[in-house]
UniProtKB/Swiss-Prot annotation:
Region: Disordered, residue numbers: 63-113
Gene: mnp-1
Domain of life (superkingdom): Eukaryota
Protein name as annotated: Matrix non-peptidase homolog 1
Signal peptide feature range: 1-27
Glycosylation sites: N54, N183, N341, N375, N520
Segments of skewed composition (Low complexity): 63-94
PANTHER family in UniProt: PROTEASE M1 ZINC METALLOPROTEASE (PTHR11533), THYROTROPIN-RELEASING HORMONE-DEGRADING ECTOENZYME (PTHR11533:SF294)
Keyword set, alphabetical order: Glycoprotein, Signal
GO-annotated cellular components: cytoplasm; extracellular space; membrane
Alphabetical list of Pfam families matching this protein: Peptidase_M1_N
Amino acid sequence: MTPPPASPSKKAKSSWLLIALIAVIIGIILCAGVITFLTLFNKNGDGPDMDWQNATEVPLTTTSKATVSTTTTQSATTPSTTTTRIEETTTTTSGAFDESVKNSEASTSTIPTTEAVPTTTATDAPEIVMPVDVASILKDKTKDFEIVEKCAEIQALPVSCTPSQSPLTSDPSKFQPIHYVLNITIRDVRKPVLEGHMQLFASTKDQVQAISLHSVKIHNLENRDRIHVVNCNTGETICVSRVHQIDDLIHLELAQSISSGVNLRVDIDGFISADSGPHVFKQIPTAKWRVPQMIGSVFEPTSARHVFPSFDLHNQKSTFNLCLNHGPSMSAIANSLINPNVSTSGISCFEKTVPLIAQQLSFVAFEKTNPLFYNTTTMDGAYLPEIDMIFNLNAKNFKQYEWIHSEVSKVMALMSKWSGFSYPLTRLEIVVAPVQAGHSALGVITLPAQAIAYQKHTSTHETLIKEVIGQWMEGVVTTEHTCFEKALIAYVEWKINEELQIVKKTRKMEVSKIRPRNLNETADSVRVLRQIKSQSSNLCSPRFVEVFYTLDETYGQETVIGMIRVIFDKFAFSTATISDWASAAETATGGRPEAGALIHQWYRPSSTISRPVLRAVVSSNSVEFNQLTEETWTVPLEISGSAGTQLAVISEKKQAIPFVSSDYVVVDAGRKSHAFVVYDADTYLRLIRCFGDSRCPSKEIGGIFSDLGAALLANILPKPENQDVAKWKSVFKFMAQQNIVEGTAACCVEHAIREMRKCSYWDIQDVCTKIDFNIVLAAVA
């Protein structure tokens, strides 16, 4: 009997089973291939399972919109905590980086860095700037630290002696401070009254018989029983025979002469500062104004001497150990972290600082305030420290202040990159306080509360940027010439704003604002530079900023950045001179000596007209320059014409530069130079035609005529020859018609051509009639 044929349903089922079996086999083969590939991939150390903890390089993960988890807490002195998440564009590293940061603080070994791998875009990945090894940089200070430790153990013995017949004096510049152990007690916040005692370790740089310290209105110093001097080299206690004050110096007369190179310890007990004025800020809560009580320092040059006796010169750096007795209701911050092993309730003692000048010492005591705290992270490859923000208000809306952290982080990342020197501390304190102007001391930034309240104001962001720059340009490297320091900070702020567009302005725009309309006058120095009128007897001129613009525009946009890198490589935690910066300028420009001369001459004491003014006479085959000022300057200038642009260096009183052009010739056509250039009458007449000509090598002819007005007011122009009077009147008539100059300059231009439409009687009588150039022109009908 034949079996019946299989049913159609069973055939279909067998087909599906066969297909499934084939699919499983193919899947197994594919899985085996993937596993084999991943195994080989990981052996090369490039796969996602790479052992980051044992890697020889720090792996980077770059994201266009990375989420940084940031803990926002009250400081250790307050119990409550809140947490917020902040979205930032940042370059993050793995946890291995955080571990390397901790290791760098405990070891002097350097941290291996990686070169960023270029992305598929045209922009290269950011340069990696790792935390600096502070211990390695300060290794040459080890001997000083040993001197302090040994000398601190020497007991000062009671000694007696008779005063000399005539008072003896010395000078603070004959000493180099090594270390301060400073204890300050806040006796009264309202006045304020500060009491203190200190140990000062210093070495002599010359033979002396008196120790001279800066001290202004500090009481209890006249009692010599409160002062002891120890010779650290011999262990001997040196008798202080007399203490007397002359002007801003307290002189401690010694019973014996001390030779150069001797290490001394000066103990001063119970001094009182009751007149610290603008050098210490305070905030007192009232029934209507419920704010945290605060008191803190905002030291400008010569401020420290109002609070404690000190060597208060700009080139006298030393380390500090500060203890602040503020009472149990308050907390405190300073340049360095609190030392928990020494601090107690009501007394905050801080770790030893890196070397600082006296004006860089900073402390703030406060109560009942709400801080914001941000953990260590990175941005664009740069290390960012912990950032602790303290406010003078009991604010509850944390997010309204997050922009401060965002801007600070961006500027710190850029400063790390430009200087090649990462922020050297583990924490930055930012204090919003009732102060007149911003202040920067290494580790502490103090911001004016009134400015921070108005985030949309341009000056608010300018202040913040300058104070962050000050962490590097004043804190890490100090320059003896304070005006150089302030001017460089102002210029770097302009460059940073061009880069980050925090404030929409350009360097060219800012230089144009401060370029004088009268060579005998300058712009508002307080607006441009970071300084306080009430605290500065000699304000710095804004003209000091211009030289950096000249360097960048003449020799390349990386010139000033190159100078900064050279200085930070050589002078971190020490003081640089103008000569050091001049040498750095020469190095940054590839060995051009005129760049160094530019720095030297720009910061030398000058006559009334403190910039180069040159008269250019254009002929068919050359341009002849005559310097019109008393001083001779070295001036790099571009000469532009039909054949192109040529860079010339003018270094003599009278100098001819070969130059041929078939049409117009313009010196400094791009307005790059800090120098003023005036011309002969024939050249000005040609420049009038150049004014609207597309072939003109300069688009800023108006500025050239404006400079003529400034030179006219300064009475520096040579008297015109009789045959040129008509030409000059044509030039001045053009200036008046085009309204190129304004104010007194416009009046004197009109006076020269007898068309005084806008002139006041006093301008004519007091200024215009006394200008030699005008006397000649006005005398001719």
